[in-house]
Amino acid sequence: QQEKLYHLGAKRIARSTLARINEEQPASLYQQLFSQLLQHFENAKGTHKFRFKNPLYSLDASHIDLSLSLCEWAKVHKSKASIKLTVGLNHSNTIPEFVALGDGIENDMVQGRTLKFPSGSIVVFDKGYIDYQWFAEMTQQNISFVTRLRPKTVYEVKSVHKVLACKGILADEYIELSSEHAKKRGAPKLLRRIEFYDVQKRRTFEFLSNNFHLAASTIAAIYKDRWKVELFFKAIKQNLKLKSFLGRSRNAIQTQIWIALIAYLLVSFAKHMAQEGWSVQRLLRIIQVNLFERKTLKALFSPDKIPIKQKEAQMSFLL
């Protein structure tokens, strides 16, 4: 790429220069830019694969590893340092619609409960986000949740419902959490327990939800669809330079993370416009390889649809 920088009339930018910019420029600037871009992309929402129309989100967090010797402020324990990225991923367009950055040592719930999901939405998350008081708050706000039931959870079965064993459903029960801890935290009066056998994994799963309208098989399928948020974390870590950082301070690290999220947002929008069925990971790799090429995004993402220009007569020999 060095020759192309030369032909552009651009000089090589020193790593120290970029690091200084990341140190001095407030991370909140890039956070606001991400939020503004997100508003522009509201009309680009697609649809998730389920029949219901409710917005579906996956809530999850992932550690972004840092150097303990360079980032002492991010210390988790004596041999690890990290910052935690929490997202609420919209399943309709695989865009992180809700984002929070916190210390790696924090419990997942610290940032998780700060995300304000819209009324009527469905949120799916793992057992790291079990908080009975939060469950009650979501129920009051008309937000449905789907999660795993923790082992040894104390509950009382209030009613049992018919199940379709052919779809892997072993039990569909309405339950009341009866432990002292659940009562103290103000858990919802009634919840739904679904027992599901996964043929592929040969495992039985127990799900907990406050949604009493969807089919039990749909509840199980919603939790299985949570893998999309894991693909999101994999994509940004592998393709958007979140393994090495320019700068050591909290501000510099957060700045680079927000820039990576902005890049992911732009590529996701380009993916929606291209409508080629390509993954965000593939589009990111194409952009990296062609970063200094004189091509439009349309030409990169839909090369077969761009007509080949005929040679000009002036540049041809008459034979």
Name the predicted role of every residue range:
Residues 8, 22-25, 29-36, 48-55, ...:
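Single, function-defining residue in the core of a domain
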